């Protein structure tokens, strides 16, 4: 499966997470026209920063594959839906390429549970580590903690979700 197929599946699956504020309404997007965009293109959504700015995020799942069968969840294991999983490297590269092109200012990341909560969180941590360390990404990251993950891994995930600018500002205090 190519990266575009994965992006299509995993951004569509992420739309069920009600944490971003885009209405999903069409905003004049017309195929082939320059300058017209849609809030639903390529998994982009909008949210507001603490200072009131509207921020565009890449909203995706690491994976929509899940070992659980929660009846309320579209990604439950018995649901007949196309499945996809990014590697940490694919997710980091996709995010940084969207960022470099000014499509997004940050990442909203969640996931189905692959094997176990800890295993899934370790993959998320790897993706965020690549973004922060290798690509020096200083944008906004919202990473959803997977229920049942060990506290140590949740702490690592949270640390990587805080921007380095924010950390540096508090180091001088």
For each feature predicted by the language model, list its residue ranges:
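Local cysteine-cluster metal-coordination motifs and their immediate loop/turn environment
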Residues: 65-75
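Single conserved hydrophobic/aromatic residue that forms the stacking wall/gate
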Residues: 171-173
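Flexible, acidic/Gly-rich N-terminal and inter-domain linker regions that tether
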Residues: 1-65
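Core AdoMet radical
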Residues: 76-91, 98-124, 130-168
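A common structural microfeature
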Residues: 52-55, 67, 106, 140
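Generic serine detector
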Residues: 11, 22-23, 38-40, 49-50, ...
């Amino acid at each position: 499966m190519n990266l575009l197929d994965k992006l299509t599946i995993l951004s569509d699956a992420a739309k069920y997470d009600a944490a971003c504020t885009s209405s999903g309404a069409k905003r004049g997007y017309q195929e082939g026209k320059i300058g017209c965009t849609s809030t639903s293109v390529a998994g982009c959504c909008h949210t507001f920063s603490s200072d009131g700015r509207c921020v565009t995020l890449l909203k995706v799942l690491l994976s929509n594959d899940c070992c659980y069968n929660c009846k309320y969840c579209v990604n439950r294991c018995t649901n007949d839906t196309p499945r996809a999983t990014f590697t940490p490297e694919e997710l980091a590269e996709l995010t940084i390429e969207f960022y470099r092109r000014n499509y997004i200012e940050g990442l909203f990341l969640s996931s189905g549970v692959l094997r176990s909560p800890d295993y899934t969180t370790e993959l998320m941590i790897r993706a965020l580590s690549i973004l922060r360390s290798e690509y020096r990404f200083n944008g906004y990251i919202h990473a959803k903690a997977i229920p049942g993950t060990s506290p140590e891994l949740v702490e690592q995930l949270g640390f990587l979700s805080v921007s380095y600018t924010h950390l540096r500002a508090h180091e001088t205090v």
